[in-house]
């Protein structure tokens, strides 16, 4: 699946905002979150380097943090905070996640209201994703179809 979002010109953002790519990776038992040593859990992803598309940054960061290889991604939405400008993607990944690089821990969560110590930004993104996933809009229906297909492919592999 090709990410069409990269065809759009970058929205003009204040210079002090960090351009981040954030992944929602649904595993069979929940959404993957990661944490560095002594830190809170966060959705995987990271900062885009100068001249790097956020979708490219996401592929690199996911590999560095979890060892997963992204097979495809679907742009979901932008999430702007006072410090970060996230592009949020649903990612279909291959492999078994393992903490790597700066990440020490991983967990799977089934609700944005999990009691896990989760960054506020990640919790807000997960709430928005849960709403989108439950919508009867074309995007919500497409999202559910993609997840169903990803689960089928995982069983076949």
Residue ranges and their predicted role:
Residues 134-155:
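Acidic/histidine-enriched, glycine/proline-rich intrinsically disordered or flexible terminal extensions
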